[in-house]
From Swiss-Prot:
Record gene name: ABP5
SUPFAM superfamilies: RmlC-like cupins
Chain's role: This is probably a receptor for the plant hormone auxin.
Species for this entry: Zea mays
Protein name as catalogued: Auxin-binding protein 5
Top-rank taxon: Eukaryota
Lineage, top ranks: Eukaryota, Viridiplantae, Streptophyta, Embryophyta, Tracheophyta
Places the protein is found: Endoplasmic reticulum lumen
Keywords: Auxin signaling pathway, Endoplasmic reticulum, Glycoprotein, Metal-binding, Receptor, Signal, Zinc
Residues involved in Zn(2+) binding: 98, 100, 104, 147
Amino acid sequence: MVRRRPATGAAQRPQLAAVGRGLLLASVLAAAASSLPVAESSCPRDNSLVRDISRMQQSNYGREGFSHITVTGALAHGTKEVEVWLQTFGPGQRTPIHRHSCEEVFIVLKGKGTLLLGSSSLKYPGQPQEVPVFQNTTFSIPVNDPHQVW
């Protein structure tokens, strides 16, 4: 997922899901360096040029069937303009309908699901549209457009 950070720099964790099948997504959070505050973290920084994803800290944020890895990020790696996330959603998972004050771009690495997008840029503004997503596809969400993935 590619996502521009809000001006506050307080990026929310994206939530993606799949019902009846698993979904593996790569996420990227992009931001203008000028809008980011200097972040302090108790996390040890890993400034290695090459990192082994299988050794990176993984969290589920208390959600069964969900896995999140920050591949590179501001707190753990000191990046200023981009964060990259790798997330896995198990069968039966679904996000709430939500929106962000930033753009997002998703890359589906494995599995399939459905994107529900309520966008003012669609043919029928205000009418949510269901769009199938599957392995090797990408999709982007405009700023503030409500969306849900399952």
